[in-house]
Amino acid sequence: MITEEQIHTLAKKKRVNETVIFREYLQVFFLSRLYSRRESENIFFKGGTALHLIFNAPRFSEDLDFTVELEEKEFLSFIWQLFRDLSKEEAVEFKERKSLAGKRFLLTAAAGVLSYKTFINLDFSFREKIFEPQKSIIETDYPVLFTSYVYHPSKGEVFAEKIRAFVTRSKGRDVYDLWYLITQGARFDMHLVKEKLRYYDLENISEDKILKTIEGFSKKDFILDMRPLVPINERDKLGDLFDYISDYIKNYLSRKNQ
C-alpha cells in the first residue's frame, strides 16, 4: 500500500497532482497482480497507459485497455476471481459498466490516503487479435513488485491502433501518441492499419484521408485534452507543442509517400 508521504514525494518529483500519482499507483498495482497469473498470457495490455508504462511516453494516462484472446466465459471467471483477491489487498471495488463492445469495469478506490475516491476504467476487447505479441518488464517508482512479464502488442501495432483511435474518436492524446511513437522508430504499416480499421468497417480509408483528419484537428481541443495528462510546468507550452507535433507528423507522412 502506498503511503500519503510517498504520494506527496512522487507528485513533487513528477510535477503532477497527487490524484495522478495515486491513480498510476493503482494502475501499476492492478497490472502486477493481473500478470502474475497464468491466464494473463492471453491478455494484452495496450493503449495510452501501456505507451506510458512500457514505452516510456512522457504523458500520463487514465484508463487501462486490453485485448483478450480467451473465451469470454473463461475470462469472466478469471477476472472476477482476480477482482475478489485484489479487494482483499487494497480498499478497492469493481463494478461492471455498460459497453458497446467487449467488457468494461470500473475500479473504485475508497477515500483513504486521499480524501476522495479515485476511479479507473478497465476496458477489455474480444473482437480483435494481436498480430505482433511481445512481453516486457515494467520498472516502477511505486511500492509494487512485479514478478512476471507484461504482455502487449509491438510498438508498430500500437502505432496502428493509435491511428485507428484517432480516426474513430479524434482526441488530442492520440495526436501526441502518434508523434511519440514516430520519434521512437514506429513505422506506418498501412496493411496493419487496415487490419485494425476492419473492426470498424473502415478498412478502405486512404492514407490521404488519415492525413487530412490529422491536419483538421484543432489546437484548442489538443490543449484541453492534454492538460490533465502532462506535468504542471509543461501545460503552458502545449500550444507550441501542438504546432510542432502537427508539422512533424505531416512531414513524416509526406516523406513516407514520396
What residue spans do the PLM features occupy?
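Active-site micro-motifs of SAM-dependent methyltransferase domains
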Residues: L51, F66
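Glycine-rich beta-strand-to-loop/alpha-helix junction loops that act as flexible
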Residues: K46-T49
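Structured mid-to-C-terminal alpha-helical surface segments
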Residues: M1-I43, I54-A57, E69-Q258
